[in-house]
């Protein structure tokens, strides 16, 4: 995969339902890999997914999906994308293998190929032993897995997953996230996950697009989003040392403990100058430095900063 290739390019997209604006002059780039579409409920995430699939016609703006125009390539776009919707989508009376095979046929696969592939994706999703059961007898976790299986049946270039861990218990959630991570990192399938759950996004995604009230508020790698302005350093000490803090402050550095043995340090100037200041203060105070790394905020802190800006 090339992480600099845009799979989806959205330009100044606006979607209105009557007087309500669901997407407001929205622009973003979705690159190869696994991207999280992050925002609170009602932010416009599902509207964006439906627009990408051609289920909703934008009020204004445009873009392309997998090189196809958003307005003129709807059918081709849907053939290249797999959708795992938030709501259940199974057909009553069908077995799991029958339902997934039918989804393959709807995507244009020959019946025999769709049936063979249905067995494969159900096995991959952990439903091999239950594939002949009617889907309505499935638990919530199993229904989530079959939604993923039907989205994968036709070998799409891009998977759209809408709240894929919705309703799952902790074990089921971990297993679903493991599946998604394997699909993205080992199977080479591009994934766009819509979620309001920050831990899910951080667990499996490389990049994130943050949406609030229909507007783009931030996009980039998770590492970029977590980066702290000014790039302070976290110094890990063997034990707490007040003299170390005093020495740093005497040299003009900003220094504050974040845990009992960790000090966050910010020094004006180059990174080399900052390291020299830290090492000199450690020597003067007798502090034992176990490690130094770039300080990061949590994804939750980064998200709250973005949406409150």
What feature does the model see in each segment?
Residues 101, 105, 112-130:
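Conserved ABC ATPase "signature" region
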Residues 159-163:
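Catalytic Walker B motif of ABC-type/P-loop ATPase nucleotide-binding domains
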């Amino acid at each position: 995969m090339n992480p600099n290739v845009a799979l989806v390019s959205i330009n100044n997209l606006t979607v209105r339902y009557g007087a309500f604006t669901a997407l407001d002059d929205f622009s973003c780039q979705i690159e190869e890999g696994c991207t999280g579409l992050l925002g609170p409920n009602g932010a416009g995430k599902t509207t964006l997914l439906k627009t990408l699939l051609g289920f909703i016609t934008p009020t204004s703006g445009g873009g392309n999906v997998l090189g196809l125009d958003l307005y003129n390539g709807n059918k081709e776009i849907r053939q290249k994308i797999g959708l795992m919707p938030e709501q259940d989508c199974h057909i009553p009376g069908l077995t799991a293998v029958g339902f997934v095979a039918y989804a393959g046929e709807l995507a244009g696969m020959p019946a025999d190929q769709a049936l063979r592939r249905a067995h494969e994706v159900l096995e991959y999703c952990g439903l091999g032993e239950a594939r002949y059961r009617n889907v309505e007898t499935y638990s919530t976790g199993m229904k989530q897995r079959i939604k993923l299986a039907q989205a994968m049946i036709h070998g799409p270039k891009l998977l759209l997953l809408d709240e894929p861990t919705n309703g799952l218990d902790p074990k089921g959630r971990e297993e679903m996230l493991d599946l998604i991570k394997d699909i993205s990192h080992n199977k080479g399938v591009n994934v766009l996950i819509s979620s309001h759950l920050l831990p899910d996004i951080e667990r499996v995604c490389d990049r994130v697009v943050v949406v609030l009230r229909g507007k783009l508020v931030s996009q980039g790698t998770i590492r970029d989003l977590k980066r702290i302005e000014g790039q302070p350093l976290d110094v890990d000490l063997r034990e707490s040392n007040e003299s170390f803090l005093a020495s740093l402050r005497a040299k003009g550095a900003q220094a504050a403990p974040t845990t009992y043995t960790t000090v966050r340090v910010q020094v004006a100037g180059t990174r080399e100058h900052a390291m020299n200041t830290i090492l000199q203060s450690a020597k003067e105070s007798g502090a034992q430095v176990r490690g130094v790394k770039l300080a990061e905020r949590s994804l939750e802190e980064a998200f709250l900063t973005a949406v409150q800006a």
